[in-house]
């Protein structure tokens, strides 16, 4: 499995009707900087760390 993020969700574009609540648009591109502990846990697959 290559890239898991949905391809139709483009950061910087406006949130269209297809990108409603729950598509991961708001969670994925929230621009808050991560703390060090969160950055450590940021990888989706622990197996590859």
UniProtKB/Swiss-Prot annotation:
Q: Which GO biological process annotations does it have?
A: asexual sporulation; sporulation resulting in formation of a cellular spore
Question: Which GO terms of the cellular component aspect does the record hold?
Answer: endospore-forming forespore
The UniProt record lists the keyword Glycoprotein: no
Highest taxon of the lineage? Bacteria
Keywords, ordered alphabetically: Sporulation
Q: Where is this region: Disordered?
A: 1-49
Q: Which InterPro entries match?
A: SASP_SspO
Q: What coarse category fits the chief subcellular location reported for this protein?
A: other
Location in the cell reads: Spore core
Q: What induces it?
A: Expressed only in the forespore compartment of sporulating cells.
Entry-linked HAMAP family:
SspO
Concerning its family, UniProt says: Belongs to the SspO family.
| Protein name per Swiss-Prot or TrEMBL | Small, acid-soluble spore protein O
Q: Which organism is it from?
A: Bacillus cytotoxicus (strain DSM 22905 / CIP 110041 / 391-98 / NVH 391-98)
């Amino acid at each position: 499995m290559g890239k898991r993020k949905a391809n139709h969700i483009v950061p910087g574009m406006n949130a269209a009707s297809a990108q409603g609540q729950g598509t991961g648009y708001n969670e994925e591109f929230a621009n808050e900087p991560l703390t060090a502990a969160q950055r450590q846990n940021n990888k989706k697959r622990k197996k590859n760390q």
